[in-house]
UniProtKB/Swiss-Prot annotation:
The name this protein goes by in its record: Uncharacterized tRNA/rRNA methyltransferase Rv3579c
Region (Disordered): 1-69
Similarity remark: Belongs to the class IV-like SAM-binding methyltransferase superfamily. RNA methyltransferase TrmH family.
Keyword S-adenosyl-L-methionine: yes
GO terms classed as biological process: methylation; RNA processing
Binding residue positions for S-adenosyl-L-methionine: G261, I281, L290
Biased composition (Basic residues): 1-16, 43-61
Domain of life: Bacteria
Amino acid sequence: MPGNSRRRGAVRKSGTKKGAGVGSGGQRRRGLEGRGPTPPAHLRPHHPAAKRARAQPRRPVKRADETETVLGRNPVLECLRAGVPATALYVALGTEADERLTECVARAADSGIAIVELLRADLDRMTANHLHQGIALQVPPYNYAHPDDLLAAALDQPPALLVALDNLSDPRNLGAIVRSVAAFGGHGVLIPQRRSASVTAVAWRTSAGAAARIPVARATNLTRTLKGWADRGVRVIGLDAGGGTALDDVDGTDSLVVVVGSEGKGLSRLVRQNCDEVVSIPMAAQAESLNASVAAGVVLAEIARQRRRPREPREQTQNRMI
């Protein structure tokens, strides 16, 4: 009879209900926390993109203080012509000789560089199977000066003229600036230890040998180093297209450090704030901004011109005009 609880099956025992008893709508609340954004395909272990990424050979990251190997006949010959300090010239046995290879061997012998002949398979292994044309040049790490030593040497030959590079990334620009510093009577170059081009074979080659005469120092903290130099009487002038001081109005006869910004972003905020003045180069209205190394060369040329013919104090010039 309906309502008779004594009838078999009239009362369902607890826990005997079919289906899930626990869930978002069950007896216990289920956490609904999200799992976060979906990772990129190459980071998912079983995705085909991840398998392709794992299959690709990984090139080790080269540190700035490691030995560098220059590959190819033209690059090696340019390094030897520029006087890049090298420790060994590797030539694969059986390599077909031409004028470039012959000149490389002759210049290495004249410079006292060890000439090592080895099997092509060994040269392939040494260069990680990169294209080498049967020849490679081993270049040791550059011996950087200390910023304090660089400043002391510059102050011994007053007025000091130094160039600091704020995160310049292209070693060719670094080499070109070193060359301009040598051409216009500068005393050295300062670069940050991180996020900056270093003195590699490319930079040395672009400097046309000036890197052998102009010291390059590396600063752990560029802003702090520039502050220390300013405390010792060196005026810090930044170079930027939006600078408030025209190059024509800069007195280049004082001890100076010219700060050149990176190719894309220019001067960083902290470095810009610690400059005594920010200088711009007057240009025609339709002209675009100059390359970093070209702009540095223009400023150094103007400073050298003023030092060859020191300008009169502004007060005397105004009185004479009156």
